[in-house]
C-alpha cells in the first residue's frame, strides 16, 4: 500500500526510514510525526505487530498522518527490493553491534536508514543482506542494550537531514 498523493509530501525525500516488523504502535506514530516534520519517507516492513489503524498509532502521530509519506511493504525483502534494487539507494542497518558510528557516514539523497523490531533489533539475516551498504551504530554508554526505536530513528534522520543542509526547513 503506497501513500496517497499529497502536495505537502516531498516527492523525492532526502532519506527513507525503514522499520522492519515494528511492534509498538506509539513508536510508529511518533516516527510518522517526525517524518512529516523533516520530509523523510517512512517505510514499514511487515508483518506489523499491530493494526496500522491502531488508536495508539493515530494518537502518537497526532494530525501529521496526512503530511507524511508512509508506505507499507509485505516484508523487508519487498521493501529492499523497491528501495535498494529498483531505487538504487544505499542501505544503512542500525545495530548496537556495529563498530562504525552513524555520524561517520556521509549521507546521500535517498539513503535508507534500516531499523529492527523493538524487542530485538535487526535479525542477523537482515544484517547479512547483500543490499545493506554498511552496519552503523548510535553511540551509547557501556552496559546499555539499546535505544527506543522512535528516538533512534529521530537521531539518525536528523543527522542525515543536517548533512543535507536541512532542505525545506524554516
What are these regions (language model features)?
Residues 1-170:
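Post-transcriptional modification and biogenesis factors for structured RNAs
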